[in-house]
Amino acid sequence: LMIKLADLLRKNAQDNILIIIAPRHIRRSMSIQNRVKSAGFDIKCRSKGDYPSKNDKFYLSDTMGEMGSLIEVADLVYVAGSMVPVGGHSPSEASQFGKPVIMGPHSEKCNAQIKDLVWSGGAIQIEKGPKMNENFLNNITELIGNNDRLEDMGKNSLIASGYAQQRADEASIHLLELLNKSNKQDVA
């Protein structure tokens, strides 16, 4: 899908975009490199000490512990694992950095957070269907270069991350109250 995106961006003269791929499983690094290269693109890899330059289209962040830095410099974050039925990955880091999020229909592992993000306008969730990939690509190309919309989405994403934190805080307080109550009953 990212290769199709790069092709589409090139055709639309939006080829000043760097697509950063940060695989959840680093063991997929060589496979990703081969797929990108076989599509006619060069790819730079963090594990080789490469850094992206102005004309690069793909950068593979195949090392651990750098997701925050990558998200911080991103204009838009695509949450992978959401276009296929694997439960979806969490957009929490992206929203905590106030970044606009785009993801597919599979968000089973983080439904409440996705609902908050979409409701707040901080994310776009592509609906499942025969035109899912096409809709994904169209949404991204519409967002790229629309700095006002990206900025608004980023602000909304940050607000939505506050909702998630508030829910977590409330759940923690409730659990502590239950634990406290249980301990008092055990003592009596």
Residue ranges with predicted function:
Residues L1-A188:
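Nucleotide-activated sugar donor-binding and catalytic core shared by glycosyltransferases
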